[in-house]
From Swiss-Prot:
Transmembrane segments: none annotated. InterPro entries: Ribosomal_uS2 (IPR001865), Ribosomal_uS2_arc (IPR023454), Ribosomal_uS2_bac/mit/plastid (IPR005706), Ribosomal_uS2_CS (IPR018130), Ribosomal_uS2_euk/arc (IPR005707), Ribosomal_uS2_flav_dom_sf (IPR023591). The lineage of its organism: Archaea, Methanobacteriati, Methanobacteriota, Archaeoglobi, Archaeoglobales. HAMAP family: Ribosomal_uS2_A (MF_00291_A), Ribosomal_uS2_B (MF_00291_B). This is Small ribosomal subunit protein uS2. It comes from the Archaea.
Length: 197
């Protein structure tokens, strides 16, 4: 009996064109299982099938939460627009730019938030949000590149978390899949999620 061919959420060429598979020249032990190969120039290439599978898992996981109880955090410039669009579509909360220390741990702060899940763009750059979420027992979902540690990350989405087009397609797919799970219309294009140059 022939094994059924895997069906991607988008054609694999769309993933490749967006550069989701482009890792870094550093590989952590945590990310080893998500590496497809290493190029001759030393660049690690991420496995797009594992990304596709994790997008499905993350969409199911996030769709279980009340939208307003999902907090997205992204310091990286190219993640601002995709995070804002995801939040508009899904109805989640977000913080782009600087994450104020104490946002998740200090009820005296005016910026204090009480999410039930935190979704960070990069656990290295957004480490303050990750450590605060961990300290108060909030699960963490993170986009992780080949150089990221997944310590304190409960659900890894293995992808290029730096590229403008890569971020657009990943957040677009997550928003689309969550909308599909919730039975909501989704009329946005990938370009709607893409940061300006």
């Amino acid at each position: 009996m022939m094994e059924k061919e895997y069906e991607y959420l988008v054609p694999p060429d769309d993933y490749l064109a967006a550069g989701v598979h482009i890792g870094t020249q550093i590989k952590t032990g945590d990310m080893k299982k998500f590496i497809f190969k290493v190029r001759q120039d030393g660049l690690y290439v991420l496995d797009i099938r594992k990304l596709d599978e994790r997008i499905r898992v993350a969409a199911k996981f996030l769709s279980r939460y009340e939208p307003s109880k999902i907090l997205l955090v992204a310091a990286r410039q190219y993640a601002h627009k995709p995070v804002q669009m995801f939040s508009k579509v899904v109805g989640s909360d977000y913080i782009v730019g600087r994450f104020i220390p104490g946002t998740l741990t200090n009820p005296m702060l005016s910026e204090y938030r009480e999410p039930e899940v935190v979704f960070v763009n990069d656990p290295a750059i957004d480490k303050q949000a990750v450590s605060e979420a961990t300290a108060v027992g909030i699960p963490v979902v993170a986009l992780c590149d080949s150089n990221n540690s997944s310590a304190d990350v409960d659900l890894v989405i293995p992808t290029n978390n730096k590229g403008r087009r890569a971020l657009a397609i990943v957040y677009w797919l997550l928003a689309r899949e969550i909308a599909k799970i919730r039975g909501q219309d989704f009329t946005y294009s990938i370009e709607d999620f893409e940061a300006e140059l």
